[in-house]
Amino acid sequence: MSTSSKPRKFTAPKGVPDYVPPNSHEFNAVRSTFHHCATVAGYEPVELPIFEDTSLFARGVGESSDVVTKEMYTFEDRGGRSMTLRPEGTAGVMRAVIEHGLDRGQLPAKLVYAGPCFRYERPQAGRYRQFQQVGVEAIGVDDPALDAEVIALAYRCFTSLGLMGFRLELTSLGDSTCRPAYREKLQAFLTSLPLDEETQHRAQINPLRVLDDKRPEVKEMTADAPLMLDYLSDEARAHFETVTGILDDLSVPYTINPRMVRGLDYYTKTCFEFVHDDLGAQSGIGGGGRYDGLMAELGGRDLSGVGFGLGVERALLALETEKKTVTDGSRVEVYGVAMGEEAHRRMPVIINDLRQSGVRADMSYGHRGLKGSMKAADRAGARFALVIGEDELAKSIVQVKDLHEGEQTAVPLDQVVQEVRGRLSA
């Protein structure tokens, strides 16, 4: 006797989250808030592919970075080409700017993007192997006022979400005239330490990366390492002082962290990160900086740029720790409850009229009965329920029930759209 096995039940891969209602509304709210903050500052949207030539990220992000050496999802396509799911957004934006000649139009080219990125990391709270990033890039002008604009934009985004427990850390990573001397000093210091072989090798390739090492023993050994802020050129120092001065004028609070090292190798001059201490060791919720040599490194003109990226999941986790919620405004406002066959035929017309007037409306399907339909209205998050039965049809009225206050009012059928719109706008 043969037995049939149940079909396999699929689940999302490890570290790859789903966002379903109601959480998807908060997810969209973070993205839309950032997009609004960017567009009012003159940033234009750009849509990019989620995979690119692997060498774009190797050259753009930095071959010695952990992102490139340990975390990228790389595959060979059927044409034998090495492709990589994007681990961050900036390199792809720069490639698009070069390819489509945006660097030869009005500068700075100010762009805003959003979409998934991929890194093979150990999944933990707010950090996933697929994560959503929103960001801005301002390309083509070396102006400290632009650095300050990007930082202030990010700050406004977090405050617009209602976050309060975050802080801004800021530093300068110098420029091409002062970094070589600092690099020599730092390498000499690191060579004198009893570091393991892999870390010593990293110190020779990119000594700044050692300062980003999270291991307690390495952090202790490098506590007295020379700091980039002590080696800034006059130009880099003036740039940094102008940035901080404008932030002071804009009332954007910050602390200077001379030991800050971002996880990507392309940053120069201004470098910043927003952190939320309630998130523990992995406290970053967004960051960015200036990258003056990146476009030339990717085959374009030698133009500067500055940008910022926000991790949507990190922002959601910060909101959760502060016990705050946000919404994207897409929940249903009005829910139709029809009792009886004729009412069920009439309700779609009413719901359609509401939708055409701009009201977010839905109705109960499947003849659930009054109790089940009212529960569905509550679950949908509706403010008002419209109830129609045989008696209401006979009188050409609709019962409008306020689900927040519990009040119910009879409204003429031909006035229901006007009545509901008025109550929603009150």
Swiss-Prot record:
Top-rank EC class of the record's enzyme: ligase
Chief site of localization: cytoplasm
Cross-referenced NCBIfam families: hisS
Binding partners and assembly: Homodimer.
PROSITE patterns, per the entry: AA_TRNA_LIGASE_II (PS50862)
The name this protein goes by in its record: Histidine--tRNA ligase
Domain of life of the organism encoding this protein: Bacteria
Family statement drawn from the similarity comment of this UniProt entry: Belongs to the class-II aminoacyl-tRNA synthetase family.
